[in-house]
Structures are given as structure tokens and as C-alpha cells.
Design a protein with these regions (language model features):
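Bacterial N-terminal signal peptides that target proteins for export
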Residues: 1-9
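Bacterial N-terminal signal peptides
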Residues: 9-18
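Beta-strand-rich N-terminal accessory domains
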Residues: 23-95, 112, 190-219, 223-226
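Extended, loop-rich substrate-binding clefts of extracytoplasmic carbohydrate-active enzymes
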Residues: 73-144
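Acidic (Asp/Glu-rich), glycine- and aromatic
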Residues: 136-185
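Beta-strand-rich recognition/accessory modules
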Residues: 212, 216-297
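Extended acidic/polar, glycine-enriched regions
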Residues: 271, 276-284, 291, 324-326, ...
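Contiguous beta-strand segments within globular domains
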Residues: 300-328
Length: 355
């Protein structure tokens, strides 16, 4: 989610660049996200948590590593589980503070993707702040978590599984690999639908809860049988073997747990989670996130052509997207590829275009 430069050239080329220098600490940009060279951290900039998009999001060297850092009501939520409603988002000097709440009554048992919201009323703030090379996440609640939801309400961060299969992780002194196939033992928990809230006046047409729940496995419920955590501890490192994807998370407020969300959802991700303790409000969650920063990393130029084609009389122009600090002014080549060989048919000097 970085601002980009563009070059513009006839038929196949354009470049763009800037002499912008990066600080060695995370800084809040004018676009509303944190940046430290090739690492970007977003916070509540987009809202689609059921699609693994929203909350605190970590992008490292062009790849989205983790996302959906937020309060959730299940250890491994899927696309049918309750999501919070975002009330506000404010930018500070070097911080982002979002205010959210449960329930979102407009989604309770209604709509194309009905969700079952429990009888839990909660307003909370998530403050995300740059602390040098670290990102500090602090969650404050407006009230303690009710006893019946202790162990269910927690802060989660989801890791994209596709790039982690067979790769290592470390939790305190324990190490392991992210498995390609979920293999954790199972455990049972009390499902939240046993404490369903009443958020409608009886005039709306609501989904049939009995049909949603069913008699066997139901992804609408999905919190009665879940995976046991692969590990518990206070400090977790994903991909310690790879400087381009290594990220360390330390919890100052309670244990971290690593879950496999694919056990009860076919589109689940790996989930790092901290449960919220009984009786706490201020500082209910405090995480220190430390992504590894590779000095002077830049992404490779990306050639963009028209997605709808070109008119026969139109100049065929393309855009070469460059990373912000990439100020190279190289010649672009147009290459014809056939069954026999490749041949350079033209050399183009790109023109600056865009930011």
C-alpha cells in the first residue's frame, strides 16, 4: 500500500522515480500507514475482515504477510463469524487509533451472509504506534469481558498460509513448521450461539437460526470444535530463516497461542492470538511487532498495459511502475518472441509520468 511512481513510454515503457530517502524507523506517512523501507504496516485502513482484509496488516517487501489484527470472538474465526463495527479512525503524530464495537446489529441474522452475534456489548480502541523499529499495538476496553465470554474474546492476527507451508516458526524455546495439511489435535469450546443476543424489534425478516446451526458441523458456528494451539508463549517469530519475511511478535499482556484456522474453515489461515484476561480494561492487549527490515530493498519494475486493449489508431502505450526510491532512467526494450528466438525490435526512452 505504497504510493508509486510511474514512467510512461510509447508501445512498452515508462519509468518513474524519486530521490525520497527512508528513515530507519517506522514513520506514519501522509497516506495513513507506517513505513520503514520495504515494510509497510496498515491499521484499519480497509474493512473486510471476513475476507482476510482489515485491522492491523503487515506487508513485507511486496508481500502481505499477516492481516486482520483485531478483537474477535473466536480463536479461529471464519467468514461467517461476527465482525466488529468500526466507529472511528484517527491519525496522530505517529499513531493510528481506531474505535470499534460489538455487536454490529445490522448484520445479526440478516443479509446474504448472516452472522450470529452473541449477547456481548463492547466498545474498544486499538492504538497502533511506531516505536522506532517496532510497532506497538494496545487495546483498551470500555468494560471487562463478561465471565461467559472469558477465553472467547481475544486479539488475533492471521498469517497467510500459502507462503508458509513447510517453513519454520519459533515460540519462546519451542520451534516447529507450518504444515501443509492441518494436523493439530482438536478441542471443544462452548459456542457463542448459546448466548445469542436480541438486536431486532421483531419487524425484520431474520434468518432461521436452527437452519443456520444445523445438526452436524456448521461453519456458521465453527467455534465449538477447534484446533488445539501448536504452541503457547510470550514471543513468536514467523520465518526466522528468511530476512524478507521474518516478523517477531511479543505479548506484554498475556500468552500468545498459535492456531491452525484451517481445521474448521476450508479458507482458514494460521492465527496468532492473545485471550483477554478477566477484569481488565486498560491495556487489555499489548503487543510489540517487529518486522525485519532489509536495507535498501526495492520492488522490481512492473509493466502495466491497457486491460481493455487499444484502438487500431491509438498509440500503444504502457506504464512501468517503479518503487518510490528507484530513480533509474534505463532504456526499455520491446522484444518480439516467436517459436525460434527472441529479438529486440525497438529501444524506447521512457518519459516521466505521474508521481
Amino acid at each position: 500500500m505504497r504510493k508509486k511512481h510511474f514512467l510512461f513510454a510509447s508501445v512498452l515503457a515508462l519509468l518513474c522515480g524519486s530521490s525520497t530517502l527512508y528513515a530507519q524507523d517506522f514513520k506514519l506517512t501522509s497516506s495513513g500507514y507506517f513505513k520503514n523501507q520495504g515494510v509497510d504496516v496498515m491499521a484499519f485502513d480497509d474493512i473486510y475482515p471476513e475476507g482476510h482484509q482489515g485491522g492491523v496488516c503487515i506487508i513485507m517487501n511486496g508481500h502481505r504477510v499477516a492481516t486482520n489484527g483485531d478483537i474477535r470472538l473466536e480463536a479461529t474465526p471464519g467468514q461467517w463469524q461476527p465482525v466488529p463495527k468500526q466507529l472511528d479512525r484517527k491519525l496522530g503524530d505517529n499513531s493510528i487509533t481506531a474505535t470499534l464495537c460489538y455487536p454490529d446489529s445490522s448484520r445479526h441474522l440478516t443479509g446474504f451472509n448472516p452472522m450470529i452475534y452473541p449477547d456481548l456489548h463492547l466498545i474498544y480502541t486499538v492504538n497502533v504506534e511506531s516505536k522506532g523499529k517496532n510497532i506497538e499495538v494496545t487495546v483498551d476496553l470500555d468494560r471487562p469481558i463478561p465471565q461467559e465470554f472469558i477465553g472467547k474474546v481475544g486479539f488475533t492476527l492471521e498469517f497467510f498460509p500459502g507462503s508458509l507451508f513447510g517453513k519454520p516458526w519459533i515460540m519462546d524455546g519451542q520451534s516447529g513448521i507450518f504444515p501443509q495439511q492441518p494436523n493439530s489435535p482438536l478441542m471443544t469450546t462452548q459456542p457463542n450461539y448459546l448466548h445469542t443476543g436480541n438486536y431486532h424489534d421483531g419487524k425484520q425478516s431474520l434468518a432461521d437460526m436452527d437452519k443456520l446451526i444445523g445438526k452436524g458441523y456448521s461453519p456458521i458456528v465453527a467455534d465449538d470444535i477447534i484446533s488445539e494451539p501448536y504452541a503457547k508463549g510470550r514471543k513468536f517469530t514467523s520465518r526466522p530463516d528468511d530476512p524478507y519475511n521474518k516478523v517477531t511478535i511479543e505479548s506484554l499482556s498475556g500468552d500468545l497461542q498459535l492456531f491452525d484456522g484451517r481445521m474448521n474453515h476450508n479458507n482458514g489461515w494460521f492465527v496468532l492470538r492473545s485471550n483477554i484476561k478477566p477484569g481488565v480494561t486498560k491495556g487489555a492487549v499489548k503487543w510489540i511487532i517487529t518486522p525485519n527490515v532489509v536495507a535498501d530493498w526495492m520492488y522490481q519494475p512492473v509493466i502495466q498495459t491497457s486491460q481493455i486493449g487499444y484502438h487500431p489508431a491509438q498509440d500503444k502505450e504502457a506504464v512501468i511502475e517503479m518503487d518510490i526510491p528507484d530513480n533509474r532512467k534505463e532504456t526499455a526494450q520491446i522484444i518480439r518472441i516467436d517459436a525460434h528466438a527472441e529479438k529486440v525490435v525497438n529501444n524506447v526512452t521512457p518519459a516521466n509520468w505521474g508521481k
